[in-house]
Structure formats: structure tokens, C-alpha cells
């Protein structure tokens, strides 16, 4: 009996943990037969009367096993004792019926058929191996042509196609000297006779000799496929099926419905069709039927096998009775509903429930209210266990009964079971890791789950009918992880930006704001109190108002660095509300943090300060108390919304009238032809935009201030206590823009296509809209809803792609030892500090010692984490750049190292080994996606106003420094004219810290000197915003060349002034003959001797070429001096580009798509000159210092940023336009690329006020750069132009260099996130992402091996993920596979390594248990 049980146990528990990798390959016919338990010969399924499977049919019990456990089909052998007996009557083995899920069968095909995946999945693998086109192969396979398999002694070629007539003619001519076949036999013959080794040698030879790029590409592709066959030992002819495997019947079930009908899987229909045709073909072959009939049958067989494998891939899809295409094997695994995404990655789990959520303000932060009935159901097994342990029930059945009848003792046991047993709450959509958090359940009556108000922000939950799911962690380890890692009170910070996410919102903010506001001349003003208690009594007895400024003694607790506490009592002059609030301050925070009106931002800062100074525990308690206080006071305040609160500004009518007059004036100008219709529209939109702003300002001034009489009887203004104003001002709800619609004017509205309607809505909701205004309003409202729906889908898809590209990036070691990093500076744009240095380096590890600039001593050592204190120190020393380690420079091969990542933002300390930083980065970028806009902005009206700046002034006092590559010349008037393309001027403070930075355009006039002190508000430089000058750097006499009126230039006469100017015209508009083709007007300069002036240090003449549209301002023979303007280019030519904004822009950046009109970067460093123009293109030549010249053709309509004789650096912009990230990587390197992508992505998020830490974007960029292209293979196994994982190349190079051979040379390549996900080494991960068929086809041919490195692959094979606490499991598993046995103590030590903050009580339980 014992051995029997042991056997049974073995049968149910196969040791699935023994494998380390999964390989995929093609199965040979013998392999398929070896899997099979018998051949399916008949298309029958189940006998409709007896419901028993037909013999030799698709559900045959003899092949697949018994239908009932331990019972043969005819019923002769029943029960366990006959285990393993094969019944002699019906031939069925007596065993478990679940073998019907795993036993396969096969069908012997009468004629070989091609596997459609290898035929049709582009590029066709069959075509590649045979070097034939897909069209040709199809003609052979579907019996339209013969193919020569063995030419013998004839002049025919192997693989040549012959039509029917050709074939008959050749047979006449050569008899049977040659073999030509049709259908899959022909292709199989070709594949069998293919000598892979020989072909590879031939191809390598061809690759050496050929020069054409296209051929190299074609050959290397084919070479790759053939080498894959060679390495994997897979024979090419296995792509042709001779035996078809049959899926186990329980995976394609047939279920009898009532009424004699059956519900069946589509696969059964597809198999039936194959079997029918196969049997018919066998019979025809036996009968020696005419060739044409056999051929037709073979073609039909090929088609039916095609649709079984991948229906609809070729021709029309096979349909069932209801005209719906049948679901083939390929459809089973691909797409959202396929095996990968539906069953392997997203399983449904037991011990879970869902219900509506309601607010639970009485809960502590780590609690949630769980309905009793739900808890009873969820914790059933625990209750059964307890009932048995206590001896209240002897069997499970009895326990079940007790629970179902809900006996009183059950409730007591439930209380006990639930104590200290966390449950996990999840709200869909789970966009980041805070969408699932653990709570300790508190039993409540009713049927709704109660949720703590402060976690609503993280869940993005509200109580308008949202539902949440509850999950119960079962094992002790799971409970411990839930408690230490997921408990709501352990997740105070947001992993996206390291700021608190447990922040009060809505009513709480309103209550706290109301409590901390100050009022003039309110009850009890000026009173003095000995302590808060006394003040409270005065308040309760109505002698004192919350807003009164009083004098009161407050107790503060000071905490020293060593943790000693001392109380200190100080007298403060503050408001009553703030004094009451001071009672709940955590020890260690001074009262000054509270002594202001608390708006939402302030409260967030307050919680942040508490977390940094007082630690997690105090902060959680503090947040809870803040919440209670806020709710209480919001109730007390009784703030409501009343019609009277919406004050319409008094000046509104005047402002609107003035705007109407302006619009009339512009309409008059338009009718008299002074402005075009476009200009008129833009101006009108502009005027109304301004008017709306003025009305809004007047309204806010009126709402925000009110007149009151103070104690001394004077009238003073105070901040208003208007309900609506308070709601917006505190940040509780609403915004200035919404109040503006309520009480100002609604302003301009957009049509559905995004264009702005020029007649605004001048009324507001308070006054009411008329029919037309209401109708116009509906446009915008409806578009908003449509936009939101679109946005959600798009944002979700972006997140999915991001997660997929980064899912295997985990912190795998503590320090990779690199000294590399990026130099971080404050981000300054348009003279304003957008992001100070402290925000950019906080939580990073510095790569070099930070040195005090004055004393030159090291203040922070390289390799130390820059926390708040370190950053404060750096700021105080006036250091304006720090080199920090980044994810992009990390040298860890697989994964990242902790030092290069820095601080784990969600925990506030150095990141742990095992943290899945890739997924966190993806979530942090994807989660705010729904807040981004979807539309592209057309620059016009309002947006273009800002563009026409004509100068910069300093915003702060300091010292001027020139930055960038500032070059300037002084002209005759002594003005400094800038002749550099990327000049910048910086204003630094006394400490030398950069305060502002401004970009200056070419041709601007500098008004300050380098190193000069300036005050705030001083003009630094001016320029004409509407034209771009061309300035001469040399003096001399102007000599025109190719300046012919009517040929290259035209005379323009200004109607108003009557002056004439020469305008350079395009060759197409030229009037004279062909002589002037390709000639461009230019100016040369002559010196006193009449010789051409040379460029300094060379023997090239100075020649300034004018581009089309330039206005030449000098005359022939005129004397010019340095810095004079030769020509002006009107700036209308820079067309207003549509700016892609919001979500599409982020997707575009991460997909690394080259922009439409990309700018051109200089490929080399050298001097620019212009060659002869060809049709429609201008020729730009860059001559390097050693004299090598490189030509570039640039379309005429493009705006060239450089001029003749200018020196450009490699990677500098020479043709205007948005940058192409691939060019940046190639010419400027990784750092420049990272900067570009980070800045661009951050710009989009910053516009919406979303904060994301740079390191998340760096992590994504690292994954986009993880592949390289081989330039020169050296002695490695790679092929030139091949794309490989960087880590793979490095490993291979290490191996080769160790043998003293030549390593492979490679260059970085940037892949978009979709491409990067699909080209990952793990085929399982790629297949579960997108294009499943293609990925699997490719992997099968190459015999790929998946080492199960990433998170996704491990989820799919059903293991713990190799991140976090799962890392220990994987390490142990590997050790055990290597034969070491590790005890439980070891596992415990590992666990503590990964989960640092395990509470003591838990650890005792675990060690005891």
C-alpha cells in the first residue's frame, strides 16, 4: 500500500523545478511519432447516443486514456486496484482521466504539407533557405508549377520552375534523366538535398567579394538563417510536415449541451476536415486515380492543414456553421485573449472578492474595513483549521456546516484569525505599484469595503461607486512580505518622484486651510493664553475665533542628532487655529512649519519634512491626526457653494466693450486691405484671449480681497473668506480657470477640429448662456469626453510597451565599480531655473569627489549617496555642477548596480539588490499618462505672441559670463555683434553659482562685457525678432558675383517708403537662359590692393553666399567694416511648425521615430562651403582640417543655419529642424542623446505639472540602447551588420581576448521600445508581447534557448520572479540543482537580506515556525 501511495504522489507532483532554461525548435517526424499514443484514423468524435468516444476517432479512449478515473471504457475494470491494466476488450489503460490533458496523438499525412508559419510569416523562412521568392514557392506548393529537384545530366537548374507544358516537353526531351516534382514533395526534395554547410561557405565567400549594399543585406540575412539551422542541428526539411500532431482531447473539449446539441472547440472541426481530406487522398492513391484529381485533393489537404495551424493566414479563413472564422492553433496563443496574456500572465486567483468602496475616516492608515460576510468567505480554510484545532468540529464537513450556518462561535474565531493577517486591496486600473496595497482588516457590518481617505490618491479612488478587489496572502512568507513591503503605512512616498503620496486632499485640505487662515478684527483678537488647553476652552465657549491672532505659549520638542528629546516652551504670536494644530506636530518639527495658511502644497511639504526629520512611524501617525483635524474643521467651517459667492467683476462690461472696439478696428483694416484674413483672425483671437485674461484678473482681484474694519476702526483689505475662492486657493478643488468660467467670461471655444472660434462666449455660468453660446459650449465638452476615452487606451498601451522593454532590468549587484557618470547642472531655460541642481542630484551617487571651490578640500567622497544634507551643503558652497553616476553608464552586464541607480525613491534609502527598477520606471512614466493631452498644438494666435522676443534682460543681480561657443565682432559703432550659432550668456551670483542662462541668436547685439557686474533688469542683448542678419567678419570693398537682376535677384520696391532692395530669387523663377543654373549670388571682399580678402589662416577667399529670400542691404563697391550687415533674411520663412504635444510626443520619443522634417547635423568637424546646386537641392561641403571634403545634398526649401566659411563641430545643427535621436547618438554620443530624450520627455510632463525623476527615463533609455551593431566581427562568431545584445558582445569579446584573438568592433544603436521588446534575447517574453507568430517562428528555426532571466518569463513558467524576495529563491534553486543542500536557516538569512525592515515579532514567529 505504501509503495502505491508513493507512486501516486510521484504521479501528481512532477519535479518541475529542475530546469534552468527552455529551448524551442522544430520537431522531426520521428519526434512527433514518439510523443504520440496512437494514430487518429477517423474523423468521428463522440457517439451521440452513448456519449462514449468513438474508437480511433478524435476522442478515442484507447489512444488518449479513460474518460473516468480508474475505469476502462467498457466497464470491465473499475477501481484503483486495477491501476495500469490495459483492458483486453476495449484496449483502454486504467488510470487517471487527467492524462487526457497530456496524451497526444498523430495523423500520418498521405502527402507532405508545408508548415504555413515558415512559409507565410514574412520574411518567408522557406524562401530564405531555398533562395526562392515566396510567389514561386507558393506556385509549387499549391500545384501550379513543377520544381526541378535533381537535374541529373540535363541542362536544367536545381530549383528551376516548370509549368505543366514545360514539364511535359522536357520529359519528351530528356526522358527520366531528371526529377521534377510538384507540391510539398518538391519543396521537401529541395530541402533534403540542400547542403547547409556548403551554402554557408559559399555565402561567406560572396559576402567578402560583393560591394553592393543590397546584396550584403540579403546575403547576411540568409547566412543568419542557415547558420541557425547549422548550430541548432535542426534539419530544414522539418519545415515540411509528414506527420501532424494532435492536441490532447481535454484541451479541445466537446461538451454535450441539453437538447442533444454539442458545444465544441473549433479545433475539432479543423482536425475533422484534415482527417477527412487525408483519408480521401489515401483512398484516391490506392485507387490510382487520375493525377489531376489527386493533385486537387493534395492541394485541399495542404489548405486544411494551413487553416488548422493558422486560419486566415492564407486565402479566406475557414468558417464554421455560423459564418464566423474558426479559431486555429495560432489564434489560441496570440493576442489579448490568447494563452500568453490571458492564462499565463494574467491568472485569476482564489481567496479573492470584490465590492464597492466607501470612506472610512475613523480607520488608521494601515487598516481597512472588511465586510463580515466577505471575511467569512475569504478566510474559510483558516476558520476550518481553527475549529478543528479547538475541537469544535471533528471533520472538515462539520466545520463547513458550522460556518455556513454562521454559528456565534464562528464570529469569535473569525476575529482571531483575522488579527494581524493583512489583506491586499487592489483598484483597477493598477497603473503603478501603489495600486495594490496591504491593510489590516477590521470587521464591519454592511457589504461595502471601507477605505482610508489618505490612500485614495495612490489608488486614484473616489467614492462614487468605485469597486475594489480583496486578496488574501496565504503563506506565512506571503503575509510577511505583504506586511513589510506593501502595508499602506510603509508606502508613504511615491516611487515616481520620492515625494509623499499620502497627502490630504479635498475636504481635509479645506479644513486645514480654514483652520490656519488669519482674520482681521474677529472675536478674541489680541488675547493671551498660557497654553493650548486654555485657548481651546476659550474657543469652545465662543469667546475666541479660529482666525484670531493671539499670544500663546506653545510646547515644542527638540530632538538632537543623538535622539535626545527636550521640551522647550516658547511664546508665539499666532492664530488660534494654528496653535490648536501645533498639538499634533511630531516631536522634532518646529512650530514655524505650521505658522502659515496651509494650502495643499504646504501640507505636502509639511509631511515631507516630517518624513525626513522624524521618520516613517511618526509621519504616519501625524498624517492620521492631520486628517482627523482637517475633517473636523471642514465640518465646523460649514463652507458651501452659493450663487452669491460668484462675484461678477464690476469692470467686465468696460473690458468687453473695449475688446469689441478693437475687433471692429481690425475688421475695418481688413476691408481696406491692410491685413490678410489670416492675420485678422489671429489678431481677433489674440484680442479676445487678452480680454478674457483681463476679466479673469479683475474677477480674482475682487474675489480674493474683501474690505473689513479693524480694531482701530480703519478699513483694511484682507484675503477673502469667500467659499469658492477658499476652495480654489487652498488647492482643495477647482482652479482659477474654473472660477473664471463661473464668474468671469467663458472666453474662446474650440471647434471639434481644434480650430478656435473667433467669437467668444462673453457671459459666464452665473449670468447664464444664450442658445448659441450653449451650443458652442457643447463642442468643447463633447470633445473632452471623446479625448479622455482615447487617452486612457493610448496611455495604457504606452505603459504596456514600457513595462515590456524594462521588465528584466533588476538591481543585481551593489556596485559595478565604474567611475563614469554624467555632469549634472541646474536646468535653465529662457533665463529661469526650471529645475534646480538639488532636485537633479538628490538621491544620486556622486561619481567624483565633490570639492569645496574655495578651500579645495573634499567635502563629499566619490561613491557616497547624496541625501538632503549633502545637497544642502553643495548648494551652500555654490557648486553648480556635480558628476553623478547614472543608469546609462552602469557597467553591470545583466541588470543594474545599486550605486548607479542611487536612492530607491519609494523608500528614501539606497536601493536594495533585487529591486525591479525597470518596472518601477515604466510605471512611473506610464501612470501619469492619462493626465497628458492627446492633441497636437497648432501654433497660432495666443501661442505665437511669446515667440517674438526682441531682447533679454537679467532677472537677478550678478556677474555676466559668456558660455556656449560665444564669438562676436565689434563694428564701427563699437557694438558687439554675435557671430556664433549657439552663444549663451549666464548671470552668476557672488558665489559663482549660475542663476540664469539665456540663448542668444546669431546677429544679436551684446550690451554687456564678459565678467561685468549687472543689476537685475539690465538689458543684456537685443535683436530684431523678425529678420536674421548676415554679418561680415572681415572688412573690405564689396564685390558682387552672380548678382544679376532677373537672373538671381529681383528688385523689390517698398510701397510705403519707395526704397528698393535686392531680393535673392529661386532658380525656378529666373527669367534668363540656362547660364544661371546652379549659380548662387555671393559677395567677395577686396582689400586696398584690389585683391580678394582671405579667411584668416587659409588661402580660401572670403565668399558669403546668399540663400533664397535674402534681402541684400549693401551695394556693389561699398566699403564695409567688421560687424556690418550684408543681408537680412526675413523670419517668416521659419514656418510655424505644429508642435506635437502630450502623449503622442512621449510615445514618439520612446519609439525613437525620426521626426518628419528632421534637422541635419554636421557629420564632421570642418569648414563649410557651398558647391554647385543640383535640381531642387543645394550642395553643402564640409572640409576637414586635413583637407578631406564631404558633400551633403540639402533640399532647397530647407533653412540652412550655417554660412560660407563657418567652422562647424561634429554634431552641430547645420539645417534647421527637430533633431533626430539616431543622429544625436551617432554624432554626439550617449550622454547627449540621454540629455535630449530626458529633457524632451520632461518638458511634456512638466507642462501638466507632473513630477517624474530623471532616473526613470534613464532606465528606459538604457534599455533602448541595449543592442549594438557589429561593424567588424574580428574573430568572433558574429556577422558584420548584425544586431546583438551588448552584454553578449562583451562576454564574447572577453572570451576572444583571453585567447589573444581580435575582438569584435561595434557601435551603439538606438531602438524604439516596441522594437527593443521584440528583439530581446528571451523569446518567451517577446512572444507574449506582440507578433507572437513571427517571434515563435524565428525562435524555432534558430533553436533558441531562453534562460528565464526576466520577470515575465518566470511568471509564464510559474515561478517566483527573480526580483525582490524571489532572488533568494532563485539563488537557492540554482545551488540545489548544483547539488548543495541549503537548510531553512539559510533561506531566512536570505530573506532578511532582501527585506531589511522585518519587525522582530514576525521574525520570531517565522523562526519558531
UniProtKB/Swiss-Prot annotation:
GO MF terms held by the record: DNA binding; DNA-directed RNA polymerase activity; magnesium ion binding; zinc ion binding
One Pfam family in the UniProt entry: RNA_pol_Rpb1_1
InterPro entries (alphabetical): DNA-dir_RpoC_beta_prime, DNA-dir_RpoC_beta_prime_bact, RNA_pol_asu, RNA_pol_N, RNA_pol_Rpb1_1, RNA_pol_Rpb1_3, RNA_pol_Rpb1_3_sf, RNA_pol_Rpb1_4
Underlying gene: rpoC
GO biological process, one term: DNA-templated transcription
Taxonomic source organism: Aromatoleum aromaticum (strain DSM 19018 / LMG 30748 / EbN1) (Azoarcus sp. (strain EbN1))
PANTHER family for this protein: DNA-DIRECTED RNA POLYMERASE, DNA-DIRECTED RNA POLYMERASE SUBUNIT BETA
Keywords assigned: DNA-directed RNA polymerase, Magnesium, Metal-binding, Nucleotidyltransferase, Transcription, Transferase, Zinc
Cofactor: Mg(2+); Zn(2+)
Gene Ontology CC annotations of this record: DNA-directed RNA polymerase complex
Residues where Zn(2+) 2 binds: 816, 890, 897, 900
Keyword Nucleotidyltransferase: yes
Disulfide bonds: none
CDD domains named in the record: RNAP_beta'_C, RNAP_beta'_N
Its biological purpose: DNA-dependent RNA polymerase catalyzes the transcription of DNA into RNA using the four ribonucleoside triphosphates as substrates.
EC number: 2.7.7.6
Catalytic activity, as annotated: RNA(n) + a ribonucleoside 5'-triphosphate = RNA(n+1) + diphosphate
Cited SMART domains: RPOLA_N
Domain of life of the organism encoding this protein: Bacteria
Annotated protein name in UniProt: DNA-directed RNA polymerase subunit beta'
KW Transferase (keyword) present: yes
Amino acid at each position: 500500500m505504501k509503495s502505491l501511495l508513493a507512486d501516486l504522489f510521484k504521479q501528481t507532483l512532477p519535479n518541475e523545478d529542475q530546469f534552468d532554461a527552455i529551448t524551442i525548435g522544430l520537431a522531426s517526424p520521428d519526434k512527433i511519432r514518439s510523443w504520440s499514443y496512437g494514430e487518429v484514423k477517423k474523423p468521428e468524435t463522440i457517439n451521440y447516443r452513448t456519449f462514449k468516444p468513438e474508437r480511433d476517432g478524435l476522442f478515442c479512449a484507447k489512444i488518449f486514456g479513460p474518460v473516468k478515473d480508474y475505469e476502462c471504457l467498457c466497464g470491465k475494470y473499475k477501481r484503483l486496484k486495477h491501476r495500469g491494466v490495459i483492458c483486453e476488450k476495449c484496449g483502454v489503460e486504467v488510470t487517471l482521466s487527467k492524462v487526457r490533458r497530456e496524451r497526444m496523438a498523430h495523423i500520418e499525412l498521405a502527402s507532405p504539407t508545408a508548415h504555413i508559419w515558415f512559409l507565410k510569416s514574412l520574411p518567408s523562412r522557406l524562401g530564405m533557405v531555398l533562395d526562392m521568392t515566396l510567389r514561386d514557392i507558393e506556385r509549387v506548393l499549391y500545384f501550379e508549377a513543377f520544381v526541378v529537384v535533381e537535374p541529373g545530366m540535363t541542362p536544367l537548374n536545381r530549383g528551376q520552375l516548370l509549368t505543366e507544358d514545360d514539364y511535359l516537353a522536357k520529359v519528351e526531351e530528356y526522358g527520366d534523366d531528371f526529377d521534377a516534382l510538384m507540391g510539398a514533395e518538391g519543396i521537401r526534395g529541395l530541402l533534403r538535398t540542400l547542403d547547409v554547410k556548403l551554402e554557408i561557405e559559399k555565402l561567406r565567400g560572396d559576402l567578402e567579394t560583393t560591394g553592393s549594399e543590397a546584396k550584403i543585406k540579403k546575403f547576411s540575412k540568409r547566412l543568419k538563417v542557415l547558420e541557425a539551422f547549422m548550430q541548432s542541428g535542426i534539419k530544414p526539411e522539418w519545415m515540411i510536415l509528414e506527420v501532424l500532431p494532435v492536441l490532447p482531447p481535454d484541451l479541445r473539449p466537446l461538451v454535450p449541451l441539453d437538447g442533444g446539441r454539442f458545444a465544441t472547440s473549433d479545433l475539432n472541426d479543423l482536425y475533422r476536415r484534415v482527417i477527412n481530406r487525408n483519408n480521401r487522398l489515401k483512398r484516391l492513391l490506392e485507387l490510382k486515380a487520375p493525377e489531376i484529381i489527386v493533385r486537387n485533393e493534395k492541394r485541399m489537404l495542404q489548405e486544411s492543414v494551413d487553416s488548422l495551424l493558422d486560419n486566415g493566414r492564407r486565402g479566406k479563413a475557414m468558417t464554421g456553421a455560423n459564418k464566423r472564422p474558426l479559431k486555429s492553433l495560432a489564434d489560441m496563443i496570440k493576442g489579448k485573449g490568447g494563452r500568453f496574456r490571458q492564462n499565463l500572465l494574467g491568472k485569476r486567483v482564489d481567496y479573492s472578492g470584490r465590492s464597492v468602496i466607501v470612506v472610512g475616516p475613523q480607520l488608521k492608515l494601515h487598516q481597512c474595513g472588511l465586510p463580515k460576510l466577505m471575511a467569512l468567505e475569504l478566510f474559510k480554510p483558516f476558520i476550518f483549521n481553527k475549529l478543528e484545532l479547538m475541537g469544535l468540529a471533528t471533520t472538515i464537513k462539520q466545520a463547513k456546516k458550522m460556518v455556513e450556518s454562521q454559528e456565534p462561535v464562528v464570529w469569535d474565531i473569525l476575529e482571531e484569525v483575522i488579527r494581524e493577517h493583512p489583506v491586499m486591496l487592489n483598484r483597477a486600473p493598477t497603473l503603478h505599484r501603489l495600486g495594490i496595497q496591504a491593510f489590516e482588516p477590521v470587521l464591519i457590518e454592511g457589504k461595502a469595503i471601507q477605505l482610508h481617505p489618505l490612500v485614495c490618491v495612490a489608488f486614484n479612488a473616489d467614492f462614487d461607486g468605485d469597486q475594489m478587489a480583496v486578496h488574501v496572502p496565504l503563506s506565512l512568507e506571503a503575509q510577511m512580505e505583504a506586511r513589510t513591503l506593501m502595508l499602506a503605512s510603509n508606502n508613504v512616498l511615491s516611487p515616481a518622484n520620492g515625494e509623499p503620496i499620502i497627502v490630504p486632499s479635498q475636504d481635509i485640505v479645506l479644513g486645514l486651510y480654514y483652520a490656519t487662515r488669519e482674520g482681521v478684527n474677529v472675536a478674541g483678537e489680541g488675547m493671551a493664553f498660557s497654553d493650548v488647553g486654555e485657548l481651546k476652552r476659550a474657543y469652545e465657549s465662543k469667546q475666541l475665533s479660529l482666525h484670531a491672532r493671539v499670544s500663546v505659549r506653545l510646547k515644542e520638542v527638540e530632538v538632537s542628532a543623538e535622539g535626545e528629546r527636550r521640551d522647550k516652551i516658547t511664546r508665539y504670536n499666532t492664530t488660534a487655529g494654528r496653535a490648536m494644530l501645533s498639538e499634533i506636530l511630531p516631536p522634532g518639527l518646529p512650530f514655524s512649519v505650521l505658522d502659515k495658511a496651509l494650502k495643499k502644497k504646504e501640507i505636502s511639504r509639511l509631511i515631507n519634512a516630517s518624513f525626513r526629520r522624524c521618520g516613517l512611524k511618526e509621519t504616519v501617525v501625524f498624517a492620521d491626526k492631520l486628517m482627523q483635524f482637517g475633517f473636523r474643521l471642514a465640518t465646523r467651517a460649514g463652507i458651501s457653494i452659493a450663487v452669491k459667492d460668484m462675484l461678477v467683476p464690476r469692470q467686465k462690461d468696460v473690458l468687453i466693450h473695449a475688446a469689441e472696439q478693437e475687433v471692429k478696428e481690425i475688421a475695418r483694416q481688413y476691408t481696406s486691405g491692410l491685413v490678410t484674413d489670416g492675420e485678422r483672425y489671429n489678431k481677433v483671437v489674440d484680442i479676445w484671449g487678452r480680454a478674457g485674461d483681463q476679466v479673469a484678473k479683475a474677477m480674482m482681484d475682487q474675489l480674493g480681497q474683501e474690505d473689513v474694519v479693524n480694531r482701530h476702526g480703519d478699513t483694511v483689505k484682507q484675503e477673502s473668506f469667500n467659499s469658492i475662492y477658499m476652495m480654489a486657493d487652498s488647492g482643495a478643488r477647482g482652479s482659477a480657470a474654473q472660477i473664471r468660467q463661473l464668474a468671469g467670461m467663458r472666453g474662446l471655444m474650440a471647434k471639434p477640429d481644434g480650430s478656435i472660434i473667433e467669437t467668444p462666449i462673453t457671459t459666464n455660468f452665473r449670468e447664464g448662456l444664450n442658445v448659441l453660446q450653449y451650443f458652442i459650449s457643447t463642442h468643447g465638452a463633447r470633445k473632452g469626453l471623446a479625448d479622455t476615452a482615447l487617452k486612457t487606451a493610448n496611455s495604457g498601451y504606452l505603459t504596456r510597451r514600457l513595462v515590456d522593454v524594462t521588465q528584466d532590468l533588476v538591481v543585481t549587484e551593489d556596485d559595478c565599480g565604474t567611475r563614469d557618470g554624467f555632469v549634472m547642472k541646474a536646468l535653465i531655460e529662457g533665463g529661469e531655473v526650471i529645475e534646480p541642481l538639488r532636485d537633479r542630484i538628490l538621491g544620486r551617487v556622486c561619481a567624483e569627489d565633490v570639492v569645496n571651490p574655495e578651500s579645495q578640500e573634499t567635502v563629499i567622497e566619490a561613491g557616497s549617496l547624496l541625501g538632503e544634507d549633502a545637497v544642502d551643503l553643495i548648494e551652500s558652497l555654490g557648486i553648480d555642477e556635480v558628476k553623478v553616476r547614472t543608469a546609462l553608464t552602469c557597467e553591470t552586464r545583466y541588470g543594474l548596480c545599486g550605486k548607479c541607480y542611487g536612492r530607491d525613491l519609494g523608500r528614501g534609502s539606497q536601493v536594495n539588490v533585487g529591486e525591479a527598477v525597470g518596472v518601477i520606471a515604466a510605471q512611473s512614466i506610464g501612470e501619469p499618462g492619462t493626465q497628458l493631452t492627446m492633441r497636437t498644438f497648432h501654433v497660432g494666435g495666443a501661442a505665437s505672441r511669446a515667440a517674438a522676443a526682441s531682447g533679454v534682460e537679467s532677472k537677478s543681480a550678478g556677474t555676466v559670463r559668456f558660455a556656449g561657443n560665444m564669438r562676436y565682432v565689434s563694428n564701427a559703432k563699437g557694438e558687439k555683434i554675435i557671430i556664433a550659432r549657439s552663444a549663451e550668456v549666464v548671470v552668476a551670483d557672488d558665489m559663482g553659482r549660475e542663476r540664469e542662462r539665456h540663448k542668444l541668436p546669431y546677429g544679436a547685439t551684446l550690451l554687456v562685457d564678459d565678467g561685468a557686474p549687472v543689476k537685475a533688469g539690465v538689458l543684456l542683448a537685443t535683436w530684431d525678432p523678425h529678420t536674421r542678419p548676415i554679418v561680415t567678419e572681415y572688412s573690405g570693398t564689396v564685390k558682387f558675383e552672380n548678382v544679376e537682376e532677373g537672373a538671381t535677384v529681383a528688385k523689390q520696391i517698398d510701397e510705403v517708403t519707395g526704397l528698393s532692395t535686392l531680393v535673392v530669387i529661386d532658380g525656378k523663377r529666373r527669367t534668363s537662359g540656362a547660364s544661371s543654373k546652379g549659380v548662387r549670388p555671393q559677395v567677395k571682399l577686396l582689400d586696398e590692393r584690389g585683391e580678394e580678402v582671405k579667411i584668416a589662416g587659409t588661402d580660401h577667399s572670403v565668399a558669403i553666399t546668399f540663400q533664397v529670400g535674402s534681402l541684400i542691404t549693401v551695394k556693389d563697391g561699398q566699403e564695409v567694416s567688421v560687424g556690418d550687415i550684408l543681408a537680412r533674411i526675413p523670419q517668416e520663412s521659419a514656418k510655424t511648425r505644429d508642435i506635437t504635444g502630450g502623449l503622442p510626443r512621449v510615445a514618439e520619443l520612446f519609439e525613437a521615430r525620426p521626426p518628419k522634417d528632421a534637422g541635419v547635423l554636421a557629420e564632421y568637424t570642418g569648414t563649410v562651403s557651398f558647391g554647385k546646386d543640383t535640381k531642387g537641392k543645394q550642395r553643402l561641403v564640409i572640409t576637414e582640417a586635413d583637407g578631406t571634403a564631404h558633400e551633403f545634398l540639402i533640399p532647397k526649401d530647407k533653412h540652412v543655419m550655417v554660412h560660407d566659411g563657418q567652422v562647424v563641430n561634429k554634431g552641430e545643427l547645420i539645417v534647421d529642424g527637430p533633431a533626430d535621436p539616431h543622429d544625436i547618438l551617432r554624432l554626439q554620443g550617449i550622454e547627449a542623446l540621454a540629455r535630449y530624450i530626458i529633457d524632451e520627455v520632461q518638458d511634456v510632463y512638466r507642462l501638466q505639472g507632473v513630477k517624474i525623476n530623471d532616473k526613470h527615463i534613464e532606465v528606459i533609455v538604457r534599455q533602448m540602447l541595449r543592442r549594438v551593431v557589429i561593424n567588424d566581427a574580428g574573430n568572433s562568431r558574429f556577422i558584420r551588420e548584425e544586431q546583438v545584445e551588448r552584454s553578449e558582445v562583451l562576454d564574447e569579446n572577453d572570451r576572444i581576448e583571453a585567447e589573444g584573438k581580435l575582438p569584435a568592433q561595434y557601435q551603439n544603436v538606438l531602438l524604439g521600445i516596441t522594437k527593443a521588446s521584440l528583439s530581446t534575447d528571451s523569446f518567451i517574453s517577446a512572444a507574449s508581447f506582440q507578433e507572437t507568430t513571427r517571434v515563435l517562428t524565428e525562435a524555432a528555426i534558430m533553436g533558441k534557448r531562453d534562460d528565464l532571466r526576466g520577470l515575465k518569463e518566470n511568471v509564464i513558467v510559474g515561478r517566483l520572479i527573480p526580483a525582490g524576495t524571489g532572488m533568494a529563491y532563485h539563488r537557492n534553486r540554482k545551488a540545489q540543482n548544483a547539488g548543495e543542500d541549503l537548510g531553512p536557516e539559510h533561506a531566512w538569512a536570505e530573506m532578511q537580506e532582501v527585506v531589511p525592515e522585518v519587525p522582530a515579532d514576525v521574525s520570531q514567529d517565522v523562526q519558531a515556525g
